[in-house]
Structures are given as C-alpha cells and as structure tokens.
C-alpha cells in the first residue's frame, strides 16, 4: 500500500515538478494479476486498479491488517468502474457480471472480493475508489443505461463533454462516495474550464482513452498559484479540496472522477473565473 500524506496549500506551491508528481500523481494503476492501492490521508480515500489476466485477483485480509481491521470493507464502501474487457466481481459468493463501462457499488461489511476477466486477451480493468463508511448500503450494479448523461460545453471553447453520473444520490445511496465518467467529444481538449474548487470535498481523476503520443496537462493548485502535472494514459491524480482540478489534452480523452467529503451535492462548487487564474 502506497501512503500519501496531506499537504498544506502553502507547502504545495513550493514544490518542484518531481515532488509534485510524487505527492499527487498515481502512475501505475493497472498491473497484470495484481491490485494496486494508494491510501491518501486526504479524507482517507483509497484509489487503485485491479487487472486479472491469467488468474483471478482477491483482496483479502492482508489489506485489512494495514487498515487496523479484518477486511477492507469492514468500515468502508467501494465503487468500481470497468474500463477494460468484460469481467466479473464476486462479492461474498455472488457473481456480478461487469462489462465495459459497467460499475459496481459494494457496501460496508462485504468480506469476499474476487475479480475475474472473461478473456485474458482482453482483460477487465477495474478502477476503484474506496472511502470510509458508517452505514451498510446494498451492493448494486450500475450500467451506462442506468445513467442519465448530461452534455455541457461547446466546440467553440473546446470543452464539449458528456458527464455520466454513476454513483450519485439520484442513482443509488452511498455513505459519501460519488463517482462518474466524463467523455470529451472528438476535437475537444478542455475539461472543467472555467474551473472550480470545492472546499467540502476532495477529488481524484483517472485519465484514460488516451493515445500513446498524447498527454493531458492537469491543472492544480490554488486559483492564484496554479501548477500542472503532465498525465499519460490510465494515470490518476489526487486533488485536495483547496485545489482546482482541470485539464487540457493534446487530443480528446475520457476521465473518471471520484469525490468524498462533507456532502454529495454535485453542484456544490466554488467557481473560479478564467480572468482570476494566475
């Protein structure tokens, strides 16, 4: 388990490129036949990926020991979105088939967590966010058909994008975790611009659907102290509540956002005008 500490905004603005990347960037999300796990002190979120190829992958009691409990979900909830080939997640003996861009919410108290791919040649890529939870909500699958997409932005400002809200109160109940998937229209490059912060929630982005020769310049920092991190395909970045989180790519891309914090009100944002950025 890779542990990342919280960083004060005054400290963050003094960091050089390599230190910014070390503190906020998660480079290796998917590793064949393993799970990856990054534990952030910011709202205690855990972020990672699971890619079964030649055999199934189980998250067992070894993780619980690192959290001071018996199992990962003794006091946590888990949200998973599959960005790879078809697979399945077995939760306490019950199999849930999870296709490309299907998602599964797993509530507090689940014990057995086994992840499998249907085909080794096209393995599932289960990206997950895991947050502290104090109530057990039912495990539930969410498919793209269950989500009402919202299209925002404009081609003229290069930010036309479709937002798919998977884990939000209108779709299912969670303790605090919210997750969704935003896809930029072809030829569009910007996400979340004009940008915002939200003092009451932190956020994690996973960028994917990127070609090998492309990148995203992820903008972070306080609005008057902006910095950037260069992101490649299937990399994630941690965004503290004091930081903007926006990006511009060399080509169109897709990203998964996950939030935890005080509330689940999607529009609870502190907007920042473009002319106020520095």
Curated annotation (Swiss-Prot):
The lineage of its organism: Bacteria, Pseudomonadati, Pseudomonadota, Gammaproteobacteria, Enterobacterales. It catalyses: 5-dehydro-4-deoxy-D-glucuronate = 3-deoxy-D-glycero-2,5-hexodiulosonate. The keyword Isomerase applies. InterPro entries: KduI (IPR007045), KduI/IolB_isomerase (IPR021120), KduI_N (IPR027449), RmlC-like_jellyroll (IPR014710), RmlC_Cupin_sf (IPR011051). Binds 1 zinc ion per subunit. This is 4-deoxy-L-threo-5-hexosulose-uronate ketol-isomerase. It comes from Salmonella heidelberg (strain SL476). Zn(2+) binds at residues 196, 198, 203, 245. Keywords: Isomerase, Metal-binding, Zinc. Its cofactor is Zn(2+).
């Amino acid at each position: 388990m890779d542990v990342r500490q919280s960083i004060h905004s005054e400290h963050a603005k003094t960091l050089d490129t390599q230190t910014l990347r070390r503190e906020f960037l998660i480079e290796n999300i998917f590793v064949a036949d393993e799970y990856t796990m990054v534990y952030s002190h910011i709202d205690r979120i855990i972020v990672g990926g699971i890619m079964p190829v030649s055999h199934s992958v189980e998250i067992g009691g070894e993780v619980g020991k690192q959290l001071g409990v018996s199992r990962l979900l003794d006091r946590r909830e888990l949200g998973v979105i599959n960005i790879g080939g078809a697979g399945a997640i077995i939760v306490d003996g019950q199999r849930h088939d999870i296709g490309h861009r299907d998602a599964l919410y797993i509530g507090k108290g689940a014990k057995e967590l086994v992840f499998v791919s249907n085909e080794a040649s096209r393995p599932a890529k289960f990206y997950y966010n895991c947050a502290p939870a104090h109530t057990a909500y039912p495990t539930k699958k969410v498919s793209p058909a269950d989500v009402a997409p919202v299209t925002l932005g404009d081609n003229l400002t290069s930010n036309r994008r479709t937002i798919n809200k998977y884990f939000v109160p209108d779709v299912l109940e969670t303790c605090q975790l919210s997750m969704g998937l935003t896809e930029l229209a072809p030829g569009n490059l910007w996400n979340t611009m004009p940008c915002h912060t939200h003092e009451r929630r932190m956020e994690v982005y996973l960028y994917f659907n990127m070609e090998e020769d492309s990148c995203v310049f992820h903008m972070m920092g306080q609005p008057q102290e902006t910095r950037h991190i260069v992101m490649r395909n299937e990399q994630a970045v941690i965004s503290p509540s004091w930081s903007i989180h926006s990006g511009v790519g060399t080509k169109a891309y897709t990203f998964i956002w996950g939030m935890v914090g005080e509330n689940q009100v999607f529009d609870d944002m502190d907007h920042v005008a473009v002319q106020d950025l520095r």
